[in-house]
């Protein structure tokens, strides 16, 4: 499983894509890098409501307070969007996640204007769910 890039490398790689077809392919590639979930993790408590596709997100906190996120989707582009969100929240504490606004990063990537309305709504649902889970941990 290849490692995900950090925020800055994500932005650089995204800006190097020549067009939106390449950007979508890059997003799909990022999703393929996510570690698989265990069968038990495909549970009701990990499913994200408000997404047209099936989305599961698992959150854990290590002893130093850093949050780890793992997830999956039955749709390739959505799985890639999960990876993008995880990159943005990487190495953060629960409080950091609550306070961090991912939207400026999406604007830098011009992501939201190139997603269908249902994918944009699903992306917002993922962010809300991650922030809510972080609030329950902190």
Curated annotation (Swiss-Prot):
Main localization category: cytoplasm
Ribonucleoprotein found in the keyword field: no
Top-level division of the source organism's lineage: Bacteria
Protein name: Cysteine desulfuration protein SufE
A single cellular component GO annotation: cytoplasm
Location in or out of the cell: Cytoplasm
Gene: sufE
Pfam families registered for this protein in UniProt: SufE
Positions of the catalytic residues: 51 (cysteine persulfide intermediate)
Record text on subunit structure and interactions: Homodimer. Interacts with SufS.
Protein purpose: Participates in cysteine desulfuration mediated by SufS. Cysteine desulfuration mobilizes sulfur from L-cysteine to yield L-alanine and constitutes an essential step in sulfur metabolism for biosynthesis of a variety of sulfur-containing biomolecules. Functions as a sulfur acceptor for SufS, by mediating the direct transfer of the sulfur atom from the S-sulfanylcysteine of SufS, an intermediate product of cysteine desulfuration process.
Pathway noted in the entry: Cofactor biosynthesis; iron-sulfur cluster biosynthesis
